[in-house]
Every structure is written in structure tokens, then in C-alpha cells.
Amino acid sequence: MVNAIKRAIEVIIGVILQFGFQILIQLYFNNNIAIIGIIYDILSILIVLKLLKDSTSLSNDLPWIMLILVFPIFGTILLLTLGGSYAKNKLLKNIYNTENEYQKYLKQDNDITKQINDNYLDNLKYLNNYARFPASTNNDVKYYNFGQDFYPSLLKELKCAEKFIFMEYFIINNGIMLENILDILKEKASLGVDVRIIYDDMGSIAMLSTNYPKQLSTYGIKCIPFNKVSPFKGIFMNNRDHRKMTIIDGKVAFSGGVNISDEYININSKLGVWKDNGIKIEGDAVFNFTVMFCSLWNANIKEDEDLLKFKYDFSNKKCNNGYV
């Protein structure tokens, strides 16, 4: 609650300052309204050109462009105040570039394509073209109906980690679930295991303090907040990271709807029985999760890594439980 109030105050103050700055400009040039119009016309043209140049999705940017062109003063003020997604444009561009760079690790095995029934081949091609991840067949998949079923398996695999642990979640909240996980992560980090955490800054805004990554670094755990909330970079906090996954040694990946918070394992759930499921994957598809995580990590940190060092060799594993 304290974190939520503190972060809310920061954002509110930032918004007030931004609006105040715009008002002061207009009051200062009150007797020269023509000058203001010219300034905003020039600024709006520059902003539109910038949006067109950096756009990764014209359908998303077009409403802003139209608003600015039709109402230069109003549209420009609104974008500068509320357009937080454009202040994050550098991050989005880094993600886009990193994902493109990592396509070299995600080649579809043509032998698998030939095995798939023609009725499903179009679905595979669609997912491969748009999600840009290959299908694989050498996998074991286990489904968990509830978070409290998923959780013990996650803890067990974390305790077995020898090389790396990558965790990415929308919500990370203090409580029993996080405490038990952190105990394992601290121990593993002390033994030289590469432990990395990504959490969404908006999703965890009421739970974690702004210096949480620094706190974890004292234990040797690397941590970054995704798309950090800043009152001076707009309040339109779009582009959130809703992914929930853990990858361990390239051998096993966990995903699903379970965040790191007690209600997801039905401890102290104020809303009754909490229903979210999860899956555990062992096999070739784990590397897809590794690439997903590293794409976001290296878009933020910009580490030049060969991701093949995180790929586990499953050539001795023979399993055919469908396609992942």
C-alpha cells in the first residue's frame, strides 16, 4: 500500500507539472498567439515525421498523427502529456530489432512441417509467420489446473538449477510465494547460477519499491523492471509485459496464468478460490521460451550474447506428445 501511494503521488505530480508547463508557455506568449500557433505547427510537423520514421505499427500511430494534423496545438499537448508509449519508443525499437536479430535461432524444422496433418498446416504457417516461433515435437507437457498444483513443481525444479534461472512476470508481490522462491534464488545465485528476473513495472507498481532491482543485486540476482513507469514520460502506460514464465537450465519451462503472488496459489485470496492454470514443458520447445526472455532482456540491457549457450541438447530424448 505504501509503494502504491508513493508511486501514485509521483505520477500525479509529474502530470500536474506537465500541464502547468504547457499553461505557463501559453500565458507567457499570451500577447503573441500567432507565435504560439507557428511554434506548435512546426512542432506538430516534426512529431508527425518522427512518428512515421520510427513507427513499427502504423495502425497504432495513425490516430495520433491524424489528431495532431487536424488539431496541432491540442494534439501536440495531448501527445506530449499522455503519449507515454512514444517516450518508450526507443525501448520498443530495441525490442523489435532484438527480436529480428534472434530469428536466426528460430528456424522451423522442415521434417516436422512434413509430419503435420494438412488440416493443421495452415495454422502452423500462420503462427510461424506472425508469432515467428517454430513448432517442435520432442516435448513432454504437463498441465496444472490450479496455481497451488503448479507451485510445488516450480519450487522443485528451481532447487535443481545448475546454470541459469530466467523469470519473467507481470506481477511480483511480497508474500509466502515470493519468499520461498527468493530463498532458492539467493542460494543459487551464491553458487554462481545466472539468475535474472524481469517484472512489469506497472503490474507490480503497488507491490514493489523502485529500488527493488538494487535490493536483489545485493544477492547476486539481476533484475530489471519492464517499461518503467515515469511521471515525466507520459501517463499513457501502454505496452505492458503480461508474460509469465520461468526457464531453468534450458531443460524446463513453466508458463500459464500464474503470477508470483499469494492469491495465485490460493493463500490469503480475498476474492475466494483463485483459478489460474499453468504448464510445464520439457523438451525442444524450451528454447523458444529462452529466446523470448532473452529478446526482452537484451533489448533493455543490450548484452551481446550467443543464445546457443542456453540451449539444452535434447537429442537423446525421444518423445512425441504432439506439437508445441
What is each of the regions a protein language model found here?
Residues 1-324:
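N-terminal localization/anchoring segments of enzymes in phospholipid and broader phosphate metabolism
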